[in-house]
UniProtKB/Swiss-Prot annotation:
Name listed for the protein in its UniProt record: Aspartyl/glutamyl-tRNA(Asn/Gln) amidotransferase subunit B
Keywords, alphabetical: ATP-binding, Ligase, Nucleotide-binding, Protein biosynthesis
SMART domains: GatB_Yqey
Organism: Helicobacter pylori (strain HPAG1)
Signal peptide (residue range): none
Primary enzyme class: ligase
Any one GO molecular function term: ATP binding
Length: 475
């Protein structure tokens, strides 16, 4: 059997989190009544003229900076011509020959070590509307039409689904950390088209590529790529490669786990690109460039800092930088004086481990301040880890609350008063003089008995303090 390798390039569409659309002042809010966020511009009515949203340009520059790309201070918009019901103008305003960003890169972690994936270009464009199919008819919602997108086009540098997913997850984290998109995949704010081909290992030639459209979950992207590699490899082995693998667009059937032919893949010439006569070229001056290039700390830099400064395990650091909100919680807890190790345990293990499928960090009701206050009480010895779990359960049940008040109400405060603990310990030893003699004659297991008696009488003492005092008295 001939060994093959995959050749994978990805086109990612990121919907930007601007308040208004790219070429008009309509709202970009999600979930509104169909066709309510529309105007003559996004409806494509004759005579309506587009006006570029400056925030879109800024966000494109920010992404270009994050991927170490060239920011082209001169770029132009072009019309991409095609007919589809959700495209009222019969063309999409995009960029073609001169995009705003070019020649970037992302470093990803693979099983064989770090790898660079080259990014050919990032361009600004408007989104199309949405077709809704119901029975024998279809509806068109144009609320999404004219919503600002950045399309990020990689070079075909990935060789398997694992590398593709590593690239996508890295890009997904970056757009969220720099604040240009919420990248919500369920709402279609971060979606991917995968271009997949195969070739014999060692061959540098590029063979027929197939495009798989509109994938919006990491799991389905991986499955679609893996299926397509298997399909093309089987066609090659059977001698039917040229009949079965043609340049086309395919869809992934999530129920069956297979790709299905959708239409022949168009070449760029089929779209008849030409400069949009209604829009000026985009000129970026030095002031705007410098202003937009000030971006938040990137996930990779944050991870290095967490491992170096807080001695975190790499896996823990990777988890924290996978989501800006996780990193924000962690740093808020540190700012409250919680130890790094305690913060990771209570955020990544205790809190995340309790969140059910429909609950997220955003809507769970337990703020970073609440979780930090609880973790700090553990560090201070004012509550045991076991009792703190009960408090956390209560916070989740009631969607938040005052941590100290809950500790008091639930009677979970630990006694840290050394004098009070000494008195109780002495009382326990006095009342169990026979067992003290047995302990001193070698029955070490009785130490647990003394701890239990003291804890029972103290009703919530700090175990470490009780242990230390007992050791001192017995030894």
């Amino acid at each position: 059997m001939m060994p093959f390798e995959a050749v994978i390039g990805l086109e990612v569409h990121v919907q930007l989190n601007t308040k208004t659309k790219i070429f008009c002042s309509c709202s970009t809010s999600f979930g509104e009544s169909p066709n309510s966020n529309t105007c003559p511009v996004c409806l494509g009515l004759p005579g309506a003229l587009p006006v570029l949203n400056k925030e879109v340009v800024k966000k494109a520059i920010q992404l270009g900076t994050a991927i170490e790309a060239n920011i082209n201070q001169y770029s132009i918009f072009a019309r991409k011509n095609y007919f589809y019901p959700d495209l009222p103008k019969a063309y999409q305003i995009s960029q073609f020959e001169v995009p705003i960003v070019s020649d970037g890169k992302l470093e990803i972690d693979t099983k064989d070590g770090a790898k660079i994936v080259r990014i050919e270009r990032v361009h600004m464009e408007e989104d199309a509307g949405k077709n809704i199919h119901e029975g024998s008819y279809s509806l068109v919602d144009l609320n999404r039409a004219c919503t600002p997108l950045l399309e990020i086009v990689s070079k075909p540098d990935m060789r398997n689904s694992e590398e593709a997913i590593a690239y996508l997850k890295k890009l997904h984290a970056i757009v969220r950390f720099i604040g240009i998109s919420d990248a919500n995949m369920q709402e279609g704010n971060f979606r991917c088209d995968a271009n997949v081909s195969i070739r014999p290992k060692g061959d540098e030639k590029l063979y027929t590529r197939v495009e798989i459209k509109n994938l919006n979950s990491f799991r389905f992207i991986a499955k679609a790529i893996e299926y397509e590699i298997e399909r093309q490899s089987a066609a090659w082995e059977s001698g039917r490669y040229h009949e079965e693998v043609v340049q086309e667009t395919r869809l992934f059937d999530t129920a069956k786990g297979i790709t299905l032919s959708m239409r022949n893949k168009e070449e760029s010439a089929d779209y008849r690109y030409f400069k949009d006569p209604d829009l000026y070229p985009v000129f970026i001056d030095e002031k705007l460039l410098k202003e937009a290039q000030k971006i938040n700390e990137l996930p990779g830099a944050k991870k290095i800092r967490y491992v170096r400064d807080f001695n975190l395990k790499e896996d823990d650091a990777n988890l924290l930088v996978s989501d800006p909100l996780l990193a924000e919680y962690f740093e808020s807890m540190l700012n409250l004086g919680v130890k790094a190790k305690t913060s990771v345990t209570w955020l990544c293990v205790e809190l995340l481990g309790r969140l059910k499928a429909e609950t997220t960090l955003e809507n769970c009701g337990v703020s970073a301040h609440m979780l930090g206050a609880l973790a700090k009480r553990i560090d201070e010895g004012k509550i045991s880890g076991k009792s703190a779990k009960d408090v956390l359960d209560k916070l989740l049940e009631e969607k938040g609350g005052d941590v100290d008040a809950l500790i008091e109400q639930m009677g979970l405060s630990q006694v840290n008063d050394t004098e009070a603990i000494v008195k109780v310990v002495e009382e326990v030893l006095k009342n169990n003089a026979d067992k003290v003699l047995e302990y001193k004659s070698g029955k070490d297991k009785l130490f647990g008995f003394f701890v239990g008696q003291a804890m029972k009488n103290l009703k919530g003492a700090n175990p470490s303090v009780v242990n230390a005092i007992l050791k001192e008295k017995l030894d």
